[in-house]
Design a protein with these regions (language model features):
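Glycan-recognition and catalytic cores of secretory/periplasmic carbohydrate-active enzymes
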Residues: 1-366
Length: 366
């Protein structure tokens, strides 16, 4: 075992040279998969098994909101020039808003059923998507919905800054005692974008509480091991709040996050040769894409925060982008055990977009 460990730790990293052209081809193909498999209602093809050439049953509205977010991100980078992407994002957003449930305190959140629970993550990523839509279009028609989603998220927040995972329409209240390792970071980014859209309304206060919780207590309280939990949503939030005046403990958390994401890329890049015996299969597209999202968001923080020491974020980001692009199938999807989900394409697209933006910045302050 000791010999195996030595071989693994000493294994060389395999990182082909990054080409933004290759990344863009993969981004476009992944987006095309989402667009061409979308139903007229706006619902995405959620899960597909290529062995039987058939969709699998079930649907996840949080991932629907995430897929919509990714399309809006791409549309912003493309400056709205690809109408198919924009129209698919709009259909996806309409699907969410048609399922909005009124909650307490003037809030709202989408649910698969009017009698079903509202998930904090769905509301948060719907808010993120609407914020991106507002940036893309300048259209203010959904400002009321954005604020209602924000009120819902604030109502889900606990005194320690963490977020409850569900709101129950039967009781008209949050479901007590159940948190989510994803929802807290998702909510922080949504509320941060809401503050950026409407400064002076107080939406930054819950964001500060969440950032303090993430930076200090979350991993231990929620028993997430090893710390820090590789939370790309937290990374997005840190990048979004770089001009807010982050405190030292927030930056220390960012450094730990960057180290974790970088370690994950390095480990994957060492899976060639004899080191293969110590590695599990490459993560699915969704999992790998979140690493790139996290690194890209943190690089933005690094470029704009002089208190942070230099770190090889761009190198890790580009290494991961090459490996992710190479893992894409000919139909534009990322498969794991011959199955793919919409969030595989979502996170891969968003992660590769982060690498593309990083390459264009060239490691320089924008």
């Amino acid at each position: 075992m000791a010999a195996l460990l030595r071989v693994t730790l000493a294994a060389p990293e395999v990182c082909p040279q990054y080409s933004p052209g290759d990344g863009q081809v993969a981004i476009d193909a992944g987006a095309d998969w989402i667009v061409r498999t979308q139903e007229p209602s706006g619902r995405y093809l959620y899960e597909y098994d290529r062995r039987i050439e058939s969709a699998k049953p079930g649907y996840n509205l949080v991932r629907h909101a995430g897929g919509t977010m990714s399309l809006y991100q791409l549309a912003i980078v493309q400056e709205g020039q690809n109408q198919e992407v924009v129209e698919a994002a709009e259909r996806g957003m309409n699907y969410l808003l048609e399922r909005a449930v009124e909650t307490d305190n003037g809030g709202m959140g989408p649910a698969l059923s009017p009698r079903g629970p509202v998930k904090t993550g769905t509301a948060a990523l719907t808010l993120v998507s609407l914020a991106h839509r507002r940036i893309l279009t300048g259209d203010e028609r959904y400002d009321g919905e954005m604020r209602a989603l924000g009120r819902f998220l604030v109502g889900q927040q606990l005194p320690d800054g963490g977020m409850l995972n569900f709101w129950d329409p039967k009781t008209g209240a949050p479901v007590p005692g159940e948190r989510s390792r994803f929802a807290t970071g998702e909510a922080s980014w949504g509320l941060a974008l809401l503050h950026e859209a409407f400064p002076g309304e107080g939406w930054d206060e819950p964001v500060w509480a969440i950032l303090d919780y993430l930076a200090t207590d979350r991993d231990e309280l929620e028993e997430l091991w090893p710390p820090p939990w590789p939370d790309q949503w937290a990374a997005y939030t840190l990048g979004e709040t770089v001009e807010w005046g982050l405190e030292d403990h927030h930056l220390a958390y960012a450094e730990r996050l960057a180290g974790r994401f970088g370690q994950m890329i390095r480990w994957d890049a060492q899976r060639e040769g004899v080191a293969k015996i110590s590695h599990l299969p490459m993560p699915r597209g969704g999992g790998y894409g979140t690493i790139l999202e996290g690194l890209g968001a943190l690089e933005w923080l690094w470029l704009n925060e002089p208190r942070l020491a230099d770190a090889p974020l761009r190198d890790r980001l580009e290494c991961g982008a090459v490996r992710l692009a190479e893992a894409q199938a000919d139909d534009g999807a990322w498969y794991y055990d011959d199955q793919t989900r919409v969030d595989d394409q979502q996170h891969a697209i968003s992660g590769l977009l982060m690498a593309d933006v990083s390459f264009n910045l060239g490691g320089n302050k924008p």
